[in-house]
Amino acid sequence: MGGFFGAVAHQDVTLDIFFGVDYHSHLGTRRGGMLIHDQQDGFQRQIHSIENTPFRTKFEKDLTEFHGQSGIGCISDTDPQPLLVRSHLGLYAITTVGIINNAEQLIQKYFSDHGHQFMAMSSGKVNSTELAAALINQKDNLVDGILHAQKEIQGSLTLLILTEKGEIIAARDRVGRLPVLIGQKEGAHCVSFESFAYHKLGYIDAYELGPQEIVRITADGFETLSPAGKEMKICAFLWTYYGYPNSNYQGINVEVMRYRNGEIMARDEISRGALPKVDYVAGVPDSGLPHAIGFANRSGKPFARPFVKYTPTWPRSFMPANQEVRNQVAKMKQIPVPELIEGKKLLFVDDSIVRGTQLRETVEFLYESGAEEVHMRSACPPIMYSCKYLNFSRGNSDMDLLARRTVQELEGDEGQQHLEEYADGTSERGQCMLKTICEKFGFTSLGYQSLEGLLEAIGLDRDKVCTYCWNGKG
């Protein structure tokens, strides 16, 4: 997906940018970028591949080359960025998070007759950050340009711009799908995707942008340049999976939400009389663990770690672009604790079940290690739709998703007309899907969190949360 961090101060901000960006490394492993601005020497920039080397290690050698009182940086799973852009609006730097689904149409509509040459990428696609900048440059000022770009883009656009004056312009997506937060400390202000990133640097919470809000940030403060809109559709997956445990979005902590989510899952199973007799409740590392702790606390079953993830030399497994590599990384990281597996009845909670490839290997791994029973629970509902609003690593087709493939196997095209029923584990079709997946993977039982339970755990009004990947309503 990606994340960003920026800061403006009366003193040098190089280390703040370096560590602030590094604290977003859980959001991507393809590219990292840093850009610092000095009033005398102008912009300094470095972009590196971080596919095989972490951001911090890759950029440490560049730190002596950077100096300045303002800067932005990013972790990107797509484009090389931040970019430097020269236009009638002046020279500025830009970094973005989001996705542009109608890139070709926009190029044809606005740029085909104007001789605009876009930077070629190895994927053959246009750099979406460059396209966003080109749309911004069609207007007479940055604010109007940002609003124009967000209106034209099908998908989402959240961004930071660093101007020649050393000011940061921050803009949250039109419906606030991703967070943008401002921190402050003496003589400095920062802007970040993850709130904990600036807490570790001595900043305190100052402000959270509303949907479509545009804010100017300087060393001495911040001001709204364009007001927030009323509609919000923040991504629910920030709490269930992508967000780091220490972060807060809309005032709701990620780790606390995950505990609450697990508790609600257990509560609902108990009320249905569906809670199995198990020796332990366990979580699939990392983000499945707090959901499992909440489940264990409410169910009264002991929590344990039947396998432990070896992390010192393995990156987060969903990030490598190649699915085969991703699966191999996931497999190599899992180290069993035989004493907690052999002859045991285990209930595992995972943050989600997407394609199911790694899950199959996890179950095989547990049975090979001597587990007697493996009950699986997903901390979110069945994923029925690939995200079209953010650049998640979820595959190229809805049929890459385990739930959709299973529906297709059961009823063919007819089943696609009944996805809402299949997503409800208490319905006849939902029960049929659960049984089929259980048989396919060898689960003793399978359960998904309900959409109502998930929204209860988040605690926001349901019309403020994007649930597209579960029910097709964004």
At which residue positions do the language-model features occur?
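Short, glycine/charge-rich flexible loops or terminal/linker lids adjacent to PRPP-binding catalytic cores
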Residues: 297-345, 384-396
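A conserved beta-strand->alpha-helix junction
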Residues: 122-133, 303-315, 410-415, 445-456
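PRPP-dependent phosphoribosyltransferase catalytic core
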Residues: 150, 165-167, 172, 202-208, ...
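Conserved short alpha-helical segments that host acidic/polar catalytic motifs at enzyme active sites
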Residues: 1-210, 216-279, 284, 373
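Long, K/E/R/D-enriched contiguous segments that form extended
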Residues: 271, 276-315
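Active-site proximal loops enriched in glycine and acidic residues that flank catalytic Cys/His/Asp
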Residues: 172, 193, 219, 282-286, ...
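Flexible loop/turn segments at secondary-structure boundaries
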Residues: 12-14, 102, 168, 177-178, ...
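Phosphate/diphosphate-binding loops
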Residues: 197, 204, 209-213, 267-273, ...
